[in-house]
Amino acid sequence: MKKLGLFLIPALAVLLSACNDDDGDYPRYTPLITTVRTIDASGSDYYFQRDNGQTLYPSDKSRVAAYRATDRQRAVIWFNLLQGIQGYDYNIALYAVQEIYTGTSEEVDTPARLEELGDSPASITPAYCNLSDEWLTLYLGYPVMDNSKHDFTLIVNRVEAPEESHEGYLDVELRHNPGSDLAGYTQWYYVSFDLTPIAPLLEGKQGVTLKIKTQQNGTKYLRLERNPGSAAQ
C-alpha cells in the first residue's frame, strides 16, 4: 500500500505561485489527479495517465529532476503544455508532482478482517470526489499527526448489509485505520483506491453507494456516478 504525501495540495499550489511570481515561470493549467506509469525500471522515465485514458508525457522534467516514479502510484501534477509529441495525447513541462495515498479495494467476508481494517471516522467533501472505471478518489479530512501511520481500504462488505442501497449501484464502504497515530488537528487529503480487485462487481453498474463513518454526522451514504474527469480542486 502506497502512502500519501504529507503536503496539502492547496499549500503546494500557493508555494509554486509564490516562488515563480517574479520570473513568470509557473504552471498555468489546472492541476490533475493522474496515475503514474513508468517506462523504465529506474523510474526516471515515466508518463501520466488521466482517468479518461488520456496520456501526458513530461519531456521537460528539469524542475522535478530528483523525482523517481512508481508504477500505478496516484499523483497530482502541475504542468504547462508544450508542442505535441508522438505517442502521447499531450507533451508537458512538469512543475511539481504530489503523490497521494494509493490504496486498494477488496471483498471482506469475515468479522476479523473488518476489525483489522479499522473503523475510524473521516470527513468527506463529495464535490471533490471522483469515480472512474479504474479508480475511486475521495477528499477526506481526519485528525492526524503522523500521516504515514494511516491506512485506508475500500471494501465490499459481505459481513454486514448496508442500511441504504440503490439499484444499479455497487455498495462499498470506506475503512480507516489510524494505526498508532495520536489525534491531531484535522487535515484534508486526497485518497485514491484501485478498483481492479472488485472490477467484476462493478460491471454494468452506474456507480457506487459509498458508506462512510463521518466525524460529525455519523454514518452517511453517498451515491457517486462514474465520471472520467480528474481535475484536482
Segments predicted by a language model, with ranges:
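Cys/His-rich zinc-coordinating "finger/knuckle" motifs
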Residues: 26
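Sec-dependent N-terminal signal peptides
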Residues: 6-10
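C-terminal motif of bacterial Sec signal peptides marking the signal peptidase cleavage site
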Residues: 14-18
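Bacterial signal peptide processing site
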Residues: 20-23
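Positively charged n-region of N-terminal signal peptides that target proteins for export
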Residues: 1-4
